[in-house]
């Protein structure tokens, strides 16, 4: 049974502008593991990576039903890749659920969709 669906889109240039004013933004959004990956990337790829992760975490928060705030933080959500490069979400908040995620980006935008599926009744 579907528990929630979330969708988010981020304008990459807008995120770049915020990042120029708030250089610690990646630390607010990314887990320590994600930060390690972020810092190993070129500057262009860093923006795409950060925008994609931000969109995925916002989409997850919408699917979860609370948004980012008191009950769910960016650090409660980690996007990892499987052995084939497919992204998946790791979160203690949905350990009994199946979470599906799709992340995409163009030169201008990053977008993500998340579906949370309840596995047990």
Curated annotation (Swiss-Prot):
InterPro entries for the chain: 4-PPantetheinyl_Trfase_dom, 4-PPantetheinyl_Trfase_dom_sf, ACPS, P-Pant_transferase_sf, Ppantetheine-prot_Trfase_dom
EC number: 2.7.8.7
One Gene Ontology term from the biological process aspect of the record: lysine biosynthetic process via aminoadipic acid
Residues bound to Mg(2+): 8, 58
Catalytic activity entry: apo-[ACP] + CoA = holo-[ACP] + adenosine 3',5'-bisphosphate + H(+)
GO cellular component: cytosol
Tree of life domain: Bacteria
Alphabetized SUPFAM superfamilies for the sequence: 4'-phosphopantetheinyl transferase (SSF56214)
HAMAP family: AcpS
Family the entry assigns: Belongs to the P-Pant transferase superfamily. AcpS family.
Record protein name field: Holo-[acyl-carrier-protein] synthase
